[in-house]
Amino acid sequence: IAAKTAAKNNLNTVLIDDKNILGGTTLFQENECFKINNSYSNEWLKKEIETLKSLENLTIKTRTSLAAYHSYNYLLARENLTDHLDINEKKDKIRQRLWKIRAKKVIIATGAMERPLIFNNNDRPGIILSSSIKKYIDYYGVKCGQKVSLFTNNDSAYETAISLNNSGVNVNSVIDIRDKTNSLIVKQAEKLGIKIHWKSSVVNTSGYKRINSIEIMKLSDDGTAVVGKKIKEECDCLGISGGWTPRVHLFTQSGGKLKFRDEDNVFLPDKSGLDQISIGSCNGDFELDQVIKNSVSSTNKFLKVNNNDYENLEIITSKEIDKKNIWLLPSDKPLGKTKPFLDFQNDSTANDIKLALREGFKSIEHVKRYTTTGMATDQGKLSNMHALGIIAETAGVKMGELGTTTFRPPYTPLTFGAIVGRNVGEFFDITRRTPIHDWHVENKAEFENVGQWKRAWYYPIDNENMHEAVQRESKAARDSAGILDASTLGKIDIQGSDASEFLNRVYTNAWSKLEIGKCRYGLMLNEDGMVYDDGVTTRLSENHYLMTTTTGGAANVLSKLEDYLQTEWPELDVYLTSVTDHYGTVSICGPNSKKILSKVIPDLDL
């Protein structure tokens, strides 16, 4: 809806979807309980997608995920190019491409992710999120089991039950922790003969390499205990659904602040300093009519347009009548004898959270690190909300007061290859030449690369090799004179009333008594006492020095000196200027060097 609105109003738009096809979960929502204009919601959506594809100023990127959202609406998107291909097809092809996007406006519609349920032995093979089971059967025609039980605290699991039933899978029952509700989707499940255990909980699971049975008991009125007899139900798959958590990760990465909604225990986008909005279930709208109505109005207001394409839609949706959260479901066994897993990758449990609180940890960040909850590769997408709920209940505080852990990029993993980029051979780099470079060329010099500089190496005559040329040049320098083009050395102009004191601090030797017109060799160390750089510095006047550095270290030395002046000694009156390119430098050596210099500069007192 947002992409269509933007594109139809002549705004250049990029629509990014991490799936291979557009539409999300609604694309396979072929159910009497979800209709738009007397058509199944998925049929209506398919027509919308066809309209989208015809818009000229809309770029659609599928199999692409926004990995990071930085300041000033700068976004990084990872496009998967070959992960879906056969191993022979993907050979020698790029796996991922990294898109760098600078947007004027950003509309976040990242949806919500299903929560698990936390109960005893909930990490056995064959225990799967209810939405995953539905996706396997609807998208790919794959059955996760032949005898499936579903355990839920909301209506979403009933959609899964109906999809499974329509596909010929035996649905044992739906175990619902709520009191009986009469929403449209529940009534439809009952008409199909699907058995429902109301106000009940799974207290244990069995099975070695795969789940083979579950134990069900009734919940007490307050939901803190289980009562009555156990019911054993054989199954080879258990779907669990603990409600939905808005995906606010990208919003918070951009610097946005969250607010907490007590009604259904979710964190929602609140304040943002960027030109962005969040719409749909990532903004807390979970019902189909809510999503469409609020998305249209928010997008129109945000883009300052008036898209009335969706004004007269007739929407039928199954309204969820009751929502109930029990963060840690009770068991008929004492807490120390149960294994209610919280982080399914790091194997941290609800017991670990309670232990952390007994040990005195109160901050969610401290509990996270003590228990490793939320520190696996999913970065807490499945576990963090339950961890917050258990902490809040145990400590007797409100969830909204606890806050959240930090949402850090990337939202989805990136390969190093995507970050580095493609290999195109040698990259362009500038070439720096000294003022007498042309003279070196005329004298047939061979050059060496020193950083970005071309520095004369040696001057072969006729067919001399490097060794022969260097021997000849060295003998000439010892017997008569030699010159060296030292223009590549870094040069820093240092001025100010505290220039001498500054040099005393950055070099190992003293500079205050150096006479004007004289030079001195200086050795510079870093903080751990290792040699950092060296060079000759000349005193040009009372408060004026010219420092030389090594060729490769010039930029680093200047940066370090600037850092010292700004952070360590801001009281010093010193000004630094890079003058490496301002002056040519020639070193003259050998017994005849004075004679040569006196002819070049006759008035110079040597």
Please state what every model-predicted region is.
Residues 1-433, 582:
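Residues forming the flavin
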Residues 256, 345-347, 370, 393-397, ...:
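Glycine/proline-enriched, intrinsically flexible loops and inter-domain linkers
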